[in-house]
Amino acid sequence: MRSDTIKSGFEKAPHRSLLKATGAIRSSSDYRKPFIGICNSYNELIPGHTHLQELGRIAKEAVREAGGVPFEFNTIGVCDGIAMGHIGMRYSLASRELIADSVETVAEAHRLDGLVCIPNCDKITPGMMMAALRINIPVIFVSGGPMKAGHTPEGKTVDLISVFEAVGQCSNGSITEGELQNIEEHACPGCGSCSGMFTANSMNCLSEALGFALPGNGTIVAEDPRRLELVKAASRRIVDLVENNVRPRDILTRQALLNAFALDFAMGGSTNTILHTLAIANEAGLSFDFSELNALSAKTPYICQVSPATMAVHIEDVDRAGGISAILKELSSIDGLLDLSAITVTGKTLGENIANAEVLDRSVIRSISDPYSATGGLAVLYGNLAPQGAVVKTGAVSPQMMQHSGPAKVYNAQDDAIKGIMEGDVKAGDVVVIRYEGPKGGPGMPEMLSPTSAIMGRGLGDSVALITDGRFSGGSRGACIGHVSPEAAERGPIAALQNGDIITIDIPARTMSVALSESTIKERLAQLPPFEPKIKRGYLARYAQLVTSANTGAILGHL
């Protein structure tokens, strides 16, 4: 066992003395057992994490019952919703790297034999996955579970996105402040990751398809007693994984990634899943290119439409309809789409995991013969504005905005764009451009939920598009095209845009372009002053120096 490095032999007497002082060692026989890290992300700042302390306690008990010795430690976490719309959002994506580095540090420094990872919200799950693949010791994921959707006294179903969009509605006078407060009070009824197919829930659902989590991980709500049973089962299972030396890189094959992307496209997951999955693939040493995604999307039907694409369905409804296993079972009937032989942490193949799954509500999970669209709910666009690609959540774009051409309304910062939208500077037909908000330019590639919600709230969702080198919340909806690569800070073509330039978006054709010649774009870029970093001290300054483009997952490169 790896942990023998810190516990076996007379030379390790000082180490054993310290281990006894932790209280985790109950008898000398514990030194013959695997040391299991309980990697918890409990904190009181994120509603999706406030209940994780109890899950950690249950996990420790289950590990001990299964024959392991548990040691709990914590990671940081950022609530994207609370960090939204101010400087805090610049730290969100950057926190993923800190989480990965910190989990790696603890597991390697203490020679842990395996990990039970308890994440929930946006950057915590991918950060822990990146670390798991980096250190490559047995691991199992069990998330905190989704929040239930909210309901107003009048019976209206609401969620966090309802509140963001209601701010825009209040600003243009379509609802009163009292009506806004009513939505605010009922949108988030309890603990859990926000209730739609936003980034947190998307990643926790993908954990099942990747093979890192037990069935039910992505959809059983946080307050459901079955969530506690899932924690127990996962925590018992890690001891078997250690004994059989089943490691993350054994599970995360190229085909497992394709399985996850197929699920992602079928349920219209957050655009951030592409960013994170590329970063996870990098840690596994797997090369995966943006351009491959459209080919997979072309043969993956969009069969499960969840908020923000519709307010009629939330994650709890997906669970009731059969969960992720039911979606995968439906997809498995498409010849060659899924690799059902992929191994998983259950000890069974993906095919065995979903063998008995069935769709219990066809209004939530459609048949592959009756999809919302014949192609997946995410797409990569290319053109002279995004030579290296840009990402759009097609499942949340209205039919009339699938093709759009209009004049650019250019902003060099998200705050300026929000002000312009709220003050009425953005008109029907415009294409809002928010640049210098990419991984380097932001820095941190902040999410654009506030401007997209303002557009929707002001009734412009069917007439205004938004493109950015930043990214979007999983809760954004509308013609929102992000991850434009190269970004403005790296002299990408988006930096050459001027107000009034005509931008054409053709999502079915997977293209996005501006009506400018290549020579004009080059001339404009040559006239720009050198990019000046917005933040010059602290972690974000270091992050901006090392981070790579969005089309590679916005991972940290090397000096």
UniProtKB/Swiss-Prot annotation:
Pfam families assigned: ILV_EDD_C, ILVD_EDD_N
GO biological process, one term: isoleucine biosynthetic process
SUPFAM superfamilies noted in UniProt: IlvD/EDD N-terminal domain-like, LeuD/IlvD-like
Position of the signal peptide: none
Keywords, alphabetical: 2Fe-2S, Amino-acid biosynthesis, Branched-chain amino acid biosynthesis, Iron, Iron-sulfur, Lyase, Magnesium, Metal-binding
Cofactor(s) annotated in UniProt: [2Fe-2S] cluster; Mg(2+)
Enzyme's top EC category: lyase
InterPro entries: Dihydro-acid_dehy_C, DihydroxyA_deHydtase, DiOHA_6PGluconate_deHydtase_CS, ILV_EDD_C, ILV_EDD_N, IlvD/EDD_N
Zinc-finger among keywords: no
Catalytic activity: (2R)-2,3-dihydroxy-3-methylbutanoate = 3-methyl-2-oxobutanoate + H2O; (2R,3R)-2,3-dihydroxy-3-methylpentanoate = (S)-3-methyl-2-oxopentanoate + H2O
GO terms, molecular function: 2 iron, 2 sulfur cluster binding; dihydroxy-acid dehydratase activity; magnesium ion binding
Active site: S473
Pathway: Amino-acid biosynthesis; L-isoleucine biosynthesis; L-isoleucine from 2-oxobutanoate: step 3/4; Amino-acid biosynthesis; L-valine biosynthesis; L-valine from pyruvate: step 3/4
Subunit structure, interactors included: Homodimer.
UniProt similarity note: Belongs to the IlvD/Edd family.
Protein name in the entry: Dihydroxy-acid dehydratase
